[in-house]
């Protein structure tokens, strides 16, 4: 069996490592436990997390055990990494609900049976800590001077960094130590924005336990312009079908830029690299075939083959004019009494767009269509005349479609 390190390297996941040669040898010779942390600030994971799930799945296929750590304790503080403002604190009930949602989504590609993977909540140990003991046992190993040079704190120093958030690095380092002691977890993985926090945990274990510990970060999922992927006009691209429908999810990947196809095939599908290279080499109109494969494969992983097939059929029906298959498109249902209202109000009511200001912005940019006619009037009223045999068709941009059916 190939060393999973080589697989991760070839597919382009790895960004930084603490001990490259040691890690390669370790992953090739032993079966280890490793962990990735998830911040439970929403009740669904999104595309940014999906890349982490893929790394976990590759590692598990090679015989290593993933530990999904949900930050029920640290989530009550908030990770300052990449943030310019302090985030709202969450209740225990919110965090517990979100943890349960995460496990269902992770289980789509991670096998949790027979302890092949486990999920833990750091609230189990962080919420019961004795502050004085924590400072004496853990705090003594952290240099404030060194912490202030970490990227995750730099951007916050000018605006103000609370002592609450300053503790986050200690908490995350302690998580790694706790997992090392309980589960013999020897490696922490995370996005490259977590590098400083990961180093803190590796260093803490080496100091406290006199044992080897390792860290690895992977690239963030960005497009060819360096912007994070997974953002739509409606917000984040969620893995929960109630938040982002399988059709919208499929369409997002079907419409990625040509320059991003190869990267996405490598990072968020399990297609063999020979097939990735073949699809990525297609040019001109043929690249659309690669995009269809990408969209189908990613949707299948998250929503299952049946939903992926439905999304594919709906997309083809839309462009091929096959109305009977439009039922798989994101559809909102309204009452006749909802007619004779402003289009911008209707779009928000049907959750097609998050706000009226967003709808007006889209109209101003010339990117909103009603029954395939460009909308130019901010005060357009939707009447019975707009209701076709297939309903009211809404298009955002070139390829994002929604349907409103009047019941």
From Swiss-Prot:
InterPro entries: aa-tRNA-synth_I_CS, aa-tRNA-synth_Ic, Rossmann-like_a/b/a_fold, S4_RNA-bd_sf, SYY-like_C, Tyr-tRNA-ligase, Tyr-tRNA-ligase_bac-type, Tyr-tRNA-ligase_bac_1
Spans through the membrane: none
'HIGH' region (motif): residue ranges: 40-49
Location of the S4 RNA-binding domain: 341-405
One GO CC term, this protein: cytoplasm
Motif ('KMSKS' region): 228-232
Keywords: Aminoacyl-tRNA synthetase, ATP-binding, Cytoplasm, Ligase, Nucleotide-binding, Protein biosynthesis, RNA-binding
Function: Catalyzes the attachment of tyrosine to tRNA(Tyr) in a two-step reaction: tyrosine is first activated by ATP to form Tyr-AMP and then transferred to the acceptor end of tRNA(Tyr).
Complex and partners: Homodimer.
UniProt-listed NCBIfam families: tyrS
Name listed for the protein in its UniProt record: Tyrosine--tRNA ligase
